[in-house]
Amino acid sequence: MQTIIRVEKLAKTFNQHQALHAVDLNIHHGEMVALLGPSGSGKSTLLRHLSGLITGDKSVGSHIELLGRTVQREGRLARDIRKSRAHTGYIFQQFNLVNRLSVLENVLIGALGSTPFWRTCFSWFTGEQKQRALQALTRVGMVHFAHQRVSTLSGGQQQRVAIARALMQQAKVILADEPIASLDPESARIVMDTLRDINQNDGITVVVTLHQVDYALRYCERIVALRQGHVFYDGSSQQFDNERFDHLYRSINRVEENAKAA
């Protein structure tokens, strides 16, 4: 099975606090993987490293590879990092859309990397690009909102627009950081259904950070759980039982309670 993401000996320190400890991870083509863990476990930090949004410590031997290209090595971004990012869709918890633009215009932003610079200066997109953007919106059930400002949409609708933008980008990997954290249950279900549909029918690899264990178990065949910056569990979601759940979350809660009591 083809390895799409390879992480070796990744460490990260923030203000003398080590957020990641020599993390090793391989993710294969077509997988839908949930990164789980309590707040502060390092899951979002790990996800940001995968696309080079942040760099790791200058650790000997640390290396991240995405789609066969080096993203960063020993704390330094690769010179051709843009080539890796060109095929990586990143979905943020807070949507990261341009409120003053329409839904369609926001989706077209996904084509900027493949559009000549002079065209991007004037937002001149081709008819073919606009058609692809409409197809992406149809895919996520948002085509009827194409000419509406994104500022008028609900959180769940905005998240689906962000997914359509990743499709417009022709992403081979989607990295989603807490995409349902601020959504109501029905909106969260629709967003996760959309990500799973893209994964299963398009073969796009999806890595998603989640707080909600039930969604991870329902939508992702594989779980990578982090605890205090270490990989605590990496395996089938079916094998992530109550005992592992308790050890991952409740032991952390006890540490926090003891710290408050002290």
Curated annotation (Swiss-Prot):
Any matching Pfam family = ABC_tran
Alphabetized UniProt keyword annotations = ATP-binding, Cell inner membrane, Cell membrane, Membrane, Nucleotide-binding, Phosphonate transport, Translocase, Transport
Which residue ranges traverse the bilayer? none
Q: Which GO terms describe its cellular component?
A: plasma membrane
Top-rank EC class of the record's enzyme: translocase
Instruction: Identify its protein family.
Output: Belongs to the ABC transporter superfamily. Phosphonates importer (TC 3.A.1.9.1) family.
The name of this protein is Phosphonates import ATP-binding protein PhnC
Source species of the chain? Escherichia coli (strain K12)
